[in-house]
């Protein structure tokens, strides 16, 4: 068999790459799975007047992972939008994103490329209060909101500034392989009165209830969706990572199957050649016994390759008889008939009378 039954370079690369990607995707899937499970097990609290009493009765006056839904209210000062009048919030994020086309030397195509060239986030202290203004209840102070993985910001301003094009610039773009399209300016805010779902550690500290990033690797959420929508979103992401893990895992198994099949075929061919060798040796022994040593003459029907041994095998499927077993074994892989140059699928012994 070609390469002595060893896998090809392409098979090795494919197996290594697919196995590594499978391990990576499975690790992400397990992380998502644990996050979904902890989110399902999180305790849900309402912003009622008895919440401080409930927390004071708990060990450490805290809940390691809790769900709170409420409206955003400022503690003291607020942030004003730079571009939209009368738009106030507690978190502001200003971004400048560069859009350009990059020449791909492999596919010979221009591909879209985005890059954040500047981003600034501002925040002021804020609380989560009951959604209805006249409703009685307590407020929860949100700490370190920028550490949330799902920060429910709303895009309130967006403007694209196209790049100025000239003939000299176009020539330079083709020489450098980069063609700027423009800069996109964006402002996002968490506005006053917005309803968000906070998931994190709930702590009672000096009569102040605080929601802060949880410990033990659990995720901190400040999402604009409700709890059910947030949970469904995380489950969808988890399922996608599971599907990707299965797809690349199947690709790894298929590649491994072809590699093992090649090894097995090589092993079967070696066994077949050993059996043929044994049959040829037995045939030669019988011929030597039948012939009189003293009446030896020149070799009849000699091998077309070495001319010193009788032809002893038939090549299939072409049917040519032109070689001894030793010369057949010496043929390079893949083995071809010396006469017609067709591939040799198998051989059968030739018994000379």
UniProtKB/Swiss-Prot annotation:
Mitochondrial intermembrane side: 30-239
Keyword Chaperone applies: no
Known EC number: 2.3.2.27
Gene3D superfamilies listed in its UniProt record: Zinc/RING finger domain, C3HC4 (zinc finger) (3.30.40.10)
Domain notes: The zinc finger domain is required for E3 ligase activity.
RING-type zinc finger span: 303-341
SUPFAM superfamilies, alphabetized: RING/U-box
Protein's cellular compartments: Mitochondrion outer membrane
InterPro entries with a match to the protein in the record: MDM2_MDM4_MUL1, MUL1-like, Znf_RING, Znf_RING/FYVE/PHD
EC supergroup of this enzyme: transferase
Protein topology in the membrane: Multi-pass membrane protein
Transmembrane segments: 9-29, 240-260
SMART domains reported in the protein's UniProt record: RING (SM00184)
Catalytic activity: S-ubiquitinyl-[E2 ubiquitin-conjugating enzyme]-L-cysteine + [acceptor protein]-L-lysine = [E2 ubiquitin-conjugating enzyme]-L-cysteine + N(6)-ubiquitinyl-[acceptor protein]-L-lysine
GO cellular component, one term: mitochondrion
Record-annotated disulphide pairs: none
Protein known as: Mitochondrial ubiquitin ligase activator of nfkb 1
MF terms (GO), sorted A to Z: identical protein binding; ubiquitin protein ligase activity; ubiquitin-protein transferase activity; zinc ion binding
Binding partners and assembly: Homooligomer.
Protein's job: E3 ubiquitin-protein ligase that plays a role in the control of mitochondrial morphology. Promotes mitochondrial fragmentation and influences mitochondrial localization. Inhibits cell growth. E3 ubiquitin ligases accept ubiquitin from an E2 ubiquitin-conjugating enzyme in the form of a thioester and then directly transfer the ubiquitin to targeted substrates.
Metabolic or biological pathway: Protein modification; protein ubiquitination
Cytoplasmic side: 1-8, 261-353
């Amino acid at each position: 068999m070609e390469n002595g039954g060893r896998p090809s370079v392409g098979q090795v690369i494919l197996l290594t790459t697919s196995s590594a990607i499978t391990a990576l995707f499975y690790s992400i899937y397990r992380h998502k799975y644990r996050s979904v499970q902890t989110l399902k097990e999180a305790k849900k609290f309402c912003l009622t007047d008895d919440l401080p009493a409930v927390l004071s009765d708990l060990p450490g006056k805290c809940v390691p992972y809790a769900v709170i839904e409420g409206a955003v209210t400022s503690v003291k000062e607020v942030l004003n939008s730079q571009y939209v009048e009368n738009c106030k919030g507690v978190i502001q994020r200003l971004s400048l994103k560069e859009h350009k086309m990059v020449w791909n030397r492999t596919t010979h195509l221009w591909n879209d490329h985005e890059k954040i060239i500047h981003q600034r986030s501002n925040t002021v202290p804020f609380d989560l209060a009951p959604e209805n203004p006249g409703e009685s209840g307590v407020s929860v102070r949100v700490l370190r909101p920028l550490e949330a993985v799902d920060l429910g910001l709303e895009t309130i301003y967006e403007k694209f500034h196209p790049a100025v094009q000239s003939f000299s610039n176009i020539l330079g773009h083709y020489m450098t392989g980069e063609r700027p399209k423009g800069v996109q300016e964006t402002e996002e805010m968490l506005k006053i009165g917005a309803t968000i779902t906070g998931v994190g550690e709930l702590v009672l500290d000096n009569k102040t209830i605080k929601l802060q990033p949880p410990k033990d690797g659990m995720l901190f959420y400040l999402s604009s969706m409700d709890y059910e929508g947030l949970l469904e979103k995380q489950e969808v992401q988890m399922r996608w990572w599971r599907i990707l893990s299965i797809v690349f895992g199947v690709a790894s198994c298929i590649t491994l199957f072809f590699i093992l099949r090649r090894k097995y075929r090589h092993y079967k061919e070696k066994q077949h050649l050993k059996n043929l060798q044994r049959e040829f040796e037995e045939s030669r022994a019988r011929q030597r016994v039948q012939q009189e040593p003293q009446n030896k003459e020149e070799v009849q029907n000699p091998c077309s390759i070495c001319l010193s041994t009788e032809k002893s095998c038939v090549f299939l499927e072409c049917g040519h008889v032109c070689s001894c077993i030793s010369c057949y074994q010496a043929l390079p892989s893949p083995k071809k008939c010396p006469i017609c140059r067709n591939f040799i699928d198998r051989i059968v012994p030739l018994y000379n009378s």
